[in-house]
Curated annotation (Swiss-Prot):
Subunit structure as annotated in this protein's UniProt entry: Binds to attractin and enticin.
Tissue: Produced by the albumen gland of the egg cordons.
Signal sequence residues: 1-22
Annotated spans, Disordered: 78-125
Record-linked PANTHER family: EF-HAND DOMAIN-CONTAINING PROTEIN
Organism expressing this protein natively: Aplysia californica
Keywords: Disulfide bond, Pheromone, Secreted, Signal
Function recorded in the entry: A component of the complex of water-borne protein pheromones that stimulates attraction and mating behavior. Modulates pheromone signaling by direct binding to attractin.
One MF annotation (Gene Ontology) recorded for this entry: pheromone activity
Top-rank taxon: Eukaryota
Protein name: Temptin
Length: 125
């Protein structure tokens, strides 16, 4: 019985570690990827910018679908898109309004960011 409990705890911890480390590589390939606010609580960071669940699990949101279609890279086309239909391009929302950001560089803007996968005016939290 104790062995089963230990195994369950180990599996739960392993799963949590995997989730915590699942998407940093994607955060690094979009401007301000590790600073995108959670639209339901802007004092928190959305860990999985491309997912319905802000922790990075579950189905992809519209930005995640567009990011996947772009080869999981920041491209000018992806930057110019308005994935969530809120009237602001993904680049504007992520601090790259001119679509010139490259991985490893500091984006043109690092504050006043918004989530490119959810229209903050209509998101249901």
């Amino acid at each position: 019985m104790e062995q089963k409990r230990t195994l369950r705890v180990f599996l739960a911890v392993s799963l949590l570690c995997a989730l915590a480390n699942a998407y940093p590589q994607y955060q690094a390939v979009i401007p301000n990827g590790s600073s995108v606010p959670n639209p339901c609580n802007t004092s928190q960071i959305a860990q999985g910018v491309g997912h319905i669940n802000f922790q990075g699990t579950g189905p992809l949101n519209p930005f995640g679908e567009d990011f996947k279609a772009a080869g999981k890279q920041w491209t000018t086309d992806l930057c110019d898109m308005d994935s969530d239909g809120d009237g602001r391009s993904n680049g504007v929302e992520l601090g790259d309004p001119e679509c010139v950001w490259s991985q490893g560089e500091t984006p043109a803007r690092t504050t006043d960011l918004s989530h490119p996968g959810f229209d903050e005016a209509t998101v249901s939290c």
